[in-house]
From Swiss-Prot:
<feature type="short sequence motif" description="'HIGH' region">
    <location>
        <begin position="30"/>
        <end position="40"/>
    </location>
</feature>
<protein>
    <recommendedName>
        <fullName>Cysteine--tRNA ligase</fullName>
        <ecNumber>6.1.1.16</ecNumber>
    </recommendedName>
</protein>
<dbReference type="InterPro" id="IPR015803">
    <property type="entry name" value="Cys-tRNA-ligase"/>
</dbReference>
<comment type="similarity">
    <text>Belongs to the class-I aminoacyl-tRNA synthetase family.</text>
</comment>
<dbReference type="GO" id="GO:0005829">
    <property type="term" value="C:cytosol"/>
</dbReference>
<dbReference type="Pfam" id="PF23493">
    <property type="entry name" value="CysS_C"/>
</dbReference>
<dbReference type="GO" id="GO:0006423">
    <property type="term" value="P:cysteinyl-tRNA aminoacylation"/>
</dbReference>
<dbReference type="GO" id="GO:0008270">
    <property type="term" value="F:zinc ion binding"/>
</dbReference>
<keyword id="KW-0030">Aminoacyl-tRNA synthetase</keyword>
<feature type="binding site">
    <location>
        <position position="237"/>
    </location>
    <ligand>
        <name>Zn(2+)</name>
    </ligand>
</feature>
<feature type="short sequence motif" description="'KMSKS' region">
    <location>
        <begin position="265"/>
        <end position="269"/>
    </location>
</feature>
<keyword id="KW-0479">Metal-binding</keyword>
<feature type="binding site">
    <location>
        <position position="28"/>
    </location>
    <ligand>
        <name>Zn(2+)</name>
    </ligand>
</feature>
<dbReference type="InterPro" id="IPR032678">
    <property type="entry name" value="tRNA-synt_1_cat_dom"/>
</dbReference>
<dbReference type="InterPro" id="IPR014729">
    <property type="entry name" value="Rossmann-like_a/b/a_fold"/>
</dbReference>
<comment type="subunit">
    <text>Monomer.</text>
</comment>
<dbReference type="InterPro" id="IPR056411">
    <property type="entry name" value="CysS_C"/>
</dbReference>
Length: 466
């Protein structure tokens, strides 16, 4: 039985899917105007683990995460780079897949894009206007916030509280300062689409509502994203979706905590803005993922090199213990005794499932993995080892690895295929021919680190595995 903290009710609740055995999940994705930063990586990793655990428990998960490819940030970037908005979006969507792929995030069931759903967005807005929940004003379309009775229920704010900070910007023709934009009138030189309200483009909030509705239906099981999206983005999504769909938008709302850099909020103005594209050149992506899951998803994370170093050491400890289990297999026997070890392994697995059932507590799940490694290190020192026990160790290691998404072997230690080695030898030969001896030495040293020895023969360079 899985329980999760529901932001909507501010308490942990037992998860009950709309459809037995199936989880419909929508996670707010990035605005693709740049490479993603580590703040974007956190929800990608956290909710990937949530998905993996549901799948481990036997659920079919329909996991939808969008790309915002029409936005003020993209338009500004377009002017800055003198490239079209679609060109910029394509570039950074490709980069997103590369970055989250390096972090071992599973591909979503679907990654809808705003530009691909423009017709549905326009129809959705028109239906809200027809029902009196929205109104057109000088080419813009606004949502009547006070028309929706439940506004503020996610962020637990009243309309009176919100009225204090609300204001009407220059050029806006709102009926009420609390109303928000569904459709923006086109400005000269900006990307735009034809609509019954005139040329323009959608507001940010309506985009997610429509894509979630198109992909998952009127009501979804789980809607997730960063804490910063809770208000106004998710609050506005609820209002426009429930006004349109006449049904609850999402039964459970999950929000992950922020990432601070050396105890300071990450921001461009402070110069501590860290892109995943850059950091994975210096930090093993597996270590970065392990670091992220070592903290509960709702808690804030403080990122610094010392803490990342601790995560690296912890992951090495787990991997080294697994390697010892594999090595001990070579001299194991078919012993029937030592059942107490099987019991201890299963107890740790039960501990892992218990903490993951409790709001996906990956921090305590990592502790269970450390306990398994400690038990494995103790077991390999026994005079005799059982094949059955070693296999059970490996099975549970694999469960932890699959659920948490952290490979048991680093990419550096994975065995190269013969054709990969031949390709590297060919690249080294080319480098030597071009007198790029630094690159030639780099390839030689990399192969040596993987216990592959190069030998010069009359027939050319050959290799052997050490």
């Amino acid at each position: 039985m899985i329980t999760l903290y529901n932001t909507l009710t501010r308490r942990k609740e037992t998860f009950e899917p709309i459809e037995p055995g199936k989880v419909k999940m929508y996670v707010c994705g990035p605005t693709v105007y740049n490479y993603i930063h580590i703040g974007n990586a956190r929800p990608a990793i956290n909710y990937d683990v949530v998905r993996r655990y549901f799948e481990y428990k036997g659920y079919e998960v329909i996991y939808v995460s969008n790309f915002t490819d029409v936005d003020d940030k993209l338009i500004n970037r377009s002017k800055e780079l003198n490239e079209s908005v679609p060109e910029i979006a394509e570039k950074y969507i490709k980069a997103f897949y590369e970055d989250v792929g390096a972090l071992n995030v599973k591909k979503a069931t679907s990654n809808p894009r705003v530009m691909h759903h423009m017709g549905e967005i326009i129809d959705f807005i028109k239906e809200l206007v027809d029902e009196g929940y929205a109104y057109e004003s000088d080419g813009d379309v606004y949502f009547r916030t006070r028309q929706f009775d439940g506004y503020g229920k996610l962020s637990h704010q009243s309309l009176d509280d919100l009225k204090v900070g609300a204001r009407i910007e220059a050029g806006e023709q709102k009926e009420d300062a609390l109303d928000f934009t569904l459709w923006k009138k086109a400005k000269p030189g900006e990307i735009s689409w034809n609509s019954p309200f005139g040329k323009g483009r959608p507001g940010w909030h309506i985009e997610c509502s429509v894509m979630a509705y198109h992909e998952l239906g009127s009501t979804i099981d789980i809607h997730a994203g960063g804490s910063d999206l809770q208000f106004p983005h998710h609050e506005n999504e609820i209002a426009q979706s429930e006004a349109h769909n006449h049904a609850p938008f999402a039964n459970y709302w999950m929000h992950n905590g922020f990432i601070n850099i050396d105890n300071e909020k990450m921001s461009k103005s402070l110069g501590n803005f860290i892109l995943v594209h850059d950091i994975i050149k210096e930090v093993d992506p597996d270590v970065l993922r392990f670091f992220m899951i070592s903290v509960h998803y709702r808690s804030p994370i403080n990122y610094n090199l010392e803490l990342v170093g601790a995560a690296r050491s912890g992951l090495e400890r787990i991997r080294n213990s697994y390697k010892l289990i594999e090595e001990r297999e070579q001299i194991a026997s078919d012993l029937e005794e030592q059942s107490e070890y099987i019991q201890q392994i299963d107890k740790i697995l039960n501990q892992f499932e218990t903490v993951m059932d409790d709001d996906f507590n990956t921090a305590n799940a990592v502790t269970a993995w450390y306990d398994l490694a400690k038990l494995a290190n103790k077991y390999v020192l026994e005079n005799t080892t059982s094949t059955k026990v070693l296999n059970r160790f490996k099975e549970v290691y694999s469960i932890f690895s699959d659920v948490l998404g952290v490979p048991l072997k680093s990419k550096e230690t994975e065995e190269l295929l013969d054709e990969d080695i031949e390709q590297l030898i060919e690249e080294r030969n080319e480098a030597r021919k071009n007198k790029d001896f630094a690159r030639a030495d780099e390839i030689r040293d990399m192969l040596k680190a993987r216990h592959i020895i190069l030998e010069d023969t009359p027939q050319g360079v050959r290799f052997k595995r050490g």
